[in-house]
Amino acid sequence: MGDYIVVLEAPIIVKDVESVEEAIEAAVNKVVNALEKEKLDFVRVELGYSKCPVCGAHFESAFVVGNVGLVGIYLTLKVFNAQSLEHAERIAKAVVGRALKKSH
């Protein structure tokens, strides 16, 4: 049994946004509120980054089309007493996923 730090990436859809900055703010707020409702304030929430396949530069994982935003969010948490890294990932997905599904 071991302790593992698990990083999950979640795609968050937000509506009625006009800019990337607004989409990022709305997505982060949505995730933080969902986690706080479930008393999961120990989960670190960060904006995701993508890598350009052409030049290799990193950019914020946020896109807006037709007032709908898609934002990639990284969720980091420590899982205690897991049997393996895969087990820790399953635990993290179950705990965080349950909280995010309730927020829809």
Swiss-Prot record:
Protein name (database record): UPF0212 protein PH1312
Q: What is the lineage of its organism?
A: Archaea, Methanobacteriati, Methanobacteriota, Thermococci, Thermococcales
Xref: InterPro entries? UPF0212
The UniProt similarity line reads: Belongs to the UPF0212 family.
| A Pfam family that the UniProt record links to this protein | DUF555
